[in-house]
Amino acid sequence: PLGRDYVKKQPFADQSKAALERLVLGKVVRLSYGGRRVDRHGRALAHLHLKDGTWVQGWLLEQGLARVYSFRDNRTRVAAMLALEEDARRRKEGLWGHRYYSILDAARSHKLVDTFQLVRARIKDAVRIKGRVYLNFGADWRKDFTVTISPKNLRLFGKAGLRPETWQGHEILVRGWINWRNGPMIDVTHPEQIEVL
């Protein structure tokens, strides 16, 4: 998955790959870029379009064959992709019918460190310390799930008119890689990773 040998294959990966191959293999595709063209692993960051106008990423999301994974410096069409993903999730289409892809409760996030997840939880405490925002979801920030936003990334939130440090008590859906730093944590790099519910 993700073109990296050390990442464990996720459930439904083979079905998604087979569907993508049926859709595009042997066909001419047009690439459209919307920011950085290559990621740090050397993969092209492009939207694919078939001759008939089919937007490949949109089709995959609509069929429940993919999740939205966006980048700070390449956010083109992310809003449209999130809407398609949400619709497929609501219908339990494709991978959304698999337990592995269920939206995670913050209390269980420690079990899925080093995986990309969607986590839904209510913010217990929202603070800004030395320019960094911490959204805490439990009584002990040293061991409970936390979302962080660096000063650099916080500027994107400001440009979008968002102030995450004021979200205490709000329920959110956050997406990203869970890492371990004083408990399970997601470092958010851009506003599209968080939806205030």
Language-model segments: which ranges?
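Electropositive
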Residues: 1-69, 141-158, 173
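OB-fold single-stranded nucleic acid-binding module
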Residues: 41, 90, 94-197
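Alpha-helix boundary/capping detector
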Residues: 46, 86-87
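Mid-sequence acidic-hydrophobic segments that form the walls
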Residues: 63, 87, 91
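Compact, glycine/acidic-enriched structural inserts
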Residues: 82-84
